[in-house]
Regions:
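Ribosome large-subunit tunnel/peptidyl-transferase-proximal elements
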Residues: 1-91, 106-117
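Short, solvent-exposed loop/turn elements at beta->coil junctions and helix N-caps
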Residues: 98-103
């Protein structure tokens, strides 16, 4: 049974998966919108929503917690100065996932993940 199994494995080991999610999170923060597979988009949403909620505190502890996941200082700066202030009044639901069809090579379902304005 699959009870209480919250995160997807994405066909990778744990270090590869955490690197993938960190890189996708950095791309989403810098570009505000990315296209990826639907499953990866759902996993990135879990990661990025937690990071934005932490970043809304905007103190040293929050910066250190975000730096554990996002090792990019420029992306961290964008998160704290541009993205998190927009969502101070919002409790979750900072991103939107829109299905865009299937990839030509392997018919993987694609989706666009973006920040809600």
């Amino acid at each position: 049974m699959r009870h209480k199994k919250l995160k997807g494995k994405l066909g990778r080991n744990s270090s590869h998966r955490s690197s993938l999610l960190a890189n996708l999170s950095i791309s989403l923060i810098t570009h505000k919108k990315i296209e990826t597979t639907f499953t990866k988009a759902k996993e990135v949403r879990r990661c990025i929503e937690k990071l934005i909620t932490i970043a809304k505190n905007n103190n040293l502890q929050a910066q250190r917690e975000v730096q554990k996941v996002i090792k990019n200082k420029q992306a961290s700066k964008i998160l704290f100065e541009e993205i998190s202030p927009k969502y101070l009044e919002r409790n979750g639901g900072y991103t939107r996932i829109v299905k865009t069809g299937f990839r030509k090579g392997d018919s993987a379902p694609l989706a666009i993940i973006e920040f809600i304005e």
